[in-house]
């Protein structure tokens, strides 16, 4: 017989080896099960999208135009393309931006949104909420859960294509293009003046017109290198400062505000802010008009929205308003504007049904909400971008830790995120719901909606009224009269009134407390204006 100690070693080794194999097998099984959804994403249906129309709303309450991308336009554009070669991001496209096909994969999703999403119904609610802010929270909407097509956010080509659509909105257009009037109050004598301002929406469709994507143009900012031809700088800055500042860009007493809602130190009129955001000459109203026209042209299509910077924030607001899938790139935090506009938000919406995505990188100070303060580049350029909270989900590429980047405003450009971020990473960023966030925590926003219901009877008059027939000559500093005089005009009025009453009654005074008389005519306040004999 051999040594029993030597006999036990092989058995122990066999048991350990078996345990290791079991653990590895289970780990591989778990890994395979987790990877399964990703494999499905790569086999999801795809469609090739091309631009079909460009809508331009001048944000003046009257001008709205549509440009159809047809053979005539392409001929005009190609002949003038050499003059637009200086425009940034043109080289991102392999062919003309108006001829390139962009492949996007979609998948089946779920959402909870309004049962009635017609522009007339939604805008009527927004108008009501504007006048009755607190009362609008008591409205119970008819929500419904339904299936819809959403972009495959785990597919790299899809995200790159959506980013290229956002970049396409910055491309310059020929000045002699044939625009169609789709507004009601367009002045034909102003042929091209409206082109220098407003919002542009580029409309892409697939061949079957199953999905329509609206790309909203972002900020053309002088000194911020955000892209564009610079024609809308001032109007873009006004809307940026209105949407993303705490109170009308009131950073200090040296700043020129974009509205008159500031009351005192860190105190702002909430109702005034909401009124300013809904003005007809603001960008939010302009994108509502663009959406109205697109739904009229494509009533049966699924509509998505996308955009970069300001265009990304506007696309998120539009998506929240009508329950649309929205993908933004390097957008400023728009959660504060969402609440100020009283946009409908379904209660208790699960994270997987949140179909608003914000794509950005950690080296972009605007996307991260840190481009503020007296010494920041944004402040020096006149932009009060004080918000950092986003609604929906955030898909953040950590280029600071992964690639060693430094925070720089140049990393906000759409060109940077396409060529240096999206094209460099092999995998897409994970999209997660951000932690709880609160903007402008040190400000006090005053609601004055109850002031309209106050009457003069319920509030004391600052100066006491004089008694009949007397007139105050001198008052103390707190309003008490200490010198009186007779008021001839009051005596004359009393005499005339008494004379009128004598025609209908034998009582010589203007106060009727007895006799066979009755009031035959009263004011809307209930005071009797004319007395007469009692009817029997």
UniProtKB/Swiss-Prot annotation:
One of its GO terms (cellular component) is multivesicular body membrane. PROSITE patterns: LIPASE_SER. The chain crosses the membrane at residues 9-31. Pfam families: Lipase_3. It is an enzyme of class 3 (hydrolase). It is a single-pass type II membrane protein. Residues 1-8 are cytoplasmic. GO terms for biological process: multivesicular body membrane disassembly; neutral lipid catabolic process; phosphatidylserine catabolic process; piecemeal microautophagy of the nucleus. Keywords: Autophagy, Endosome, Glycoprotein, Hydrolase, Lipid degradation, Lipid metabolism, Membrane, Signal-anchor, Transmembrane, Transmembrane helix. Its EC number is 3.1.1.3. It is found in: Endosome, Multivesicular body membrane; Prevacuolar compartment membrane. It catalyses: a triacylglycerol + H2O = a diacylglycerol + a fatty acid + H(+). The active site is at 309 (charge relay system). Glycans are attached at residues 152, 187, 293, 426, 516. Residues 32-536 are lumenal. Lipase which is essential for lysis of subvacuolar cytoplasm to vacuole targeted bodies and intravacuolar autophagic bodies. Involved in the lysis of intravacuolar multivesicular body (MVB) vesicles. The intravacuolar membrane disintegration by ATG15 is critical to life span extension. Binds to both phosphatidylinositol (PI) and phosphatidylinositol 3,5-bisphosphate (PIP2). Belongs to the AB hydrolase superfamily. Lipase family. This is Putative lipase ATG15.
